[in-house]
Design a protein with these regions (language model features):
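Short beta-strand-centered segments at strand-helix junctions
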Residues: 14-26
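Regulatory sensory and allosteric helical modules in signal-transduction proteins
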Residues: 92-128
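Short hydrophobic alpha-helical segments used for membrane anchoring or interfacial signaling
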Residues: 73-86
């Protein structure tokens, strides 16, 4: 007999309580949308909904364009993972969980730029120990319907590079465009 996990009853309104341990493990916050699926065996499947994840192919193309245009590494994330990268190591970033620092920037809807080479770059993924490998960085939140749904990030490894207004505006344009695509 296979393990059944946690057993819960459905209340009068059709609600099921997801245990705190599972929510913490899967990083599901209060009010966060979930997709509900059923399979042929009658199982109900809950999946975290990522609005920008639906645009992952489009986001990949957009990241490639950003990278070619700016000459920098371009990343696009949803709230949980890196969904597109161009100009940098895909293995290191793609489908990796975002760092707590980046998650906090998203929560605060904060625009971050490492202005000087002495400024510390925000780690992108949880595995990113950020041993000074990025000398310049712009992080711009993707906002749709007033909520942050991800980020556009430009990175540079070159020691004499500084992100200026042009890079900020490019990241802002990309974030605004992706956010508006989700509102359609």
């Amino acid at each position: 007999m296979k393990a059944t996990g946690v057993v819960r009853r459905i209340d009068d309104l059709g609600r099921v309580v997801i245990p705190k341990e599972i929510r913490k493990t899967l990083r599901i916050k209060e009010g966060e949308p979930l997709e509900i699926f059923t399979d042929r065996e009658g199982q109900v499947i809950l999946k975290k909904y990522s609005p920008i994840g639906e645009l992952s192919e489009f986001a990949t193309g957009y990241a490639e364009t950003l990278s070619k245009t700016t000459g920098h590494i371009a990343c696009i994330t949803d709230k949980d993972t890196v969904i597109a990268i161009s100009g940098g190591p895909k293995k290191e970033f793609l489908e990796q969980n975002v760092s707590d620092e980046l998650e906090q920037l998203m929560e605060d809807k904060e625009i971050y730029t490492s202005k000087e080479n002495s400024d510390v770059a925000v780690p992108i993924t949880k595995n990113d120990n950020n041993e000074r490998k990025y000398n310049a960085q712009v992080v711009y939140p993707i906002i749709s319907n007033g909520d942050t749904i991800g980020t556009v990030i430009l990175l540079s490894k070159e020691s004499n590079t500084k992100m200026n207004e042009v890079e900020k505006k490019v990241a802002q344009s990309a974030a605004s465009f992706l956010g508006s695509q989700m509102e359609i």
